């Protein structure tokens, strides 16, 4: 029964992706369909129309496999060795700056959310 629930949870998450892809195709949006599906899921979870516990275990199992999807993109960088050696320091600086900005903005928004709930 546990595996059936896990399969059902992952299946529903996949359906959100398919619906998002369908919406993207029908309305010819430039946003990826999977992102539209994630936004729909986020809205339904944040408005508590769908409870988080319905997806929790399935999402945890999918997160285990997430690093496997990053390996091909990392190995693909080896094809651009000369570009990375010439522009690598600029790219590294941009990544560090964008990470710091993201951390600051996320922290600020988190603080706003915490103080607004009190």
From Swiss-Prot:
GO CC, alphabetical: plasma membrane
Keyword match Repeat: no
UniProt keyword annotation of Transmembrane present: yes
GO biological process: cytolysis; killing of cells of another organism; programmed cell death
Membrane topology: Multi-pass membrane protein
Subcellular location: Cell membrane
InterPro entries named among the record's database cross-references: Holin-like_CidA, LrgA/CidA
Keywords from the named record: Cell membrane, Cytolysis, Membrane, Transmembrane, Transmembrane helix
TM region(s), chain numbering: 5-27, 31-50, 62-84, 88-110
Main location (coarse class): membrane
Family: Belongs to the CidA/LrgA family. CidA subfamily.
Function noted in UniProt: Increases the activity of extracellular murein hydrolases possibly by mediating their export via hole formation. Inhibited by the antiholin-like proteins LrgAB. In an unstressed cell, the LrgAB products probably inhibit the function of the CidA protein. When a cell is stressed by the addition of antibiotics or by other factors in the environment, CidA possibly oligomerizes within the bacterial cell membrane, creating lesions that disrupt the proton motive force, which in turn results in loss of cell viability.
HAMAP family from the UniProt entry: CidA
PANTHER family on file: HOLIN-LIKE PROTEIN CIDA-RELATED, INTEGRAL MEMBRANE PROTEIN YXZK-RELATED
Name of the protein in question: Holin-like protein CidA 2
Gene coding for it: cidA2
């Amino acid at each position: 029964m546990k595996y059936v629930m896990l399969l059902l949870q992952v299946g529903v998450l996949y359906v959100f992706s398919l619906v998002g892809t369908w919406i993207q195709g029908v309305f010819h949006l430039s946003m990826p369909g999977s992102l539209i599906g994630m936004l729909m899921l986020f809205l339904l979870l944040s408005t508590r129309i769908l409870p988080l516990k319905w997806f929790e275990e399935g999402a945890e199992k999918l997160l285990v496999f997430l690093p496997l999807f990053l390996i091909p993109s990392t190995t693909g960088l080896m094809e651009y060795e000369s570009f990375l050696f010439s522009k690598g320091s600029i790219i590294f600086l941009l990544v560090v700056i964008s990470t710091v900005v993201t951390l600051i903005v996320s922290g600020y928004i988190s603080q706003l959310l915490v103080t607004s709930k009190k």
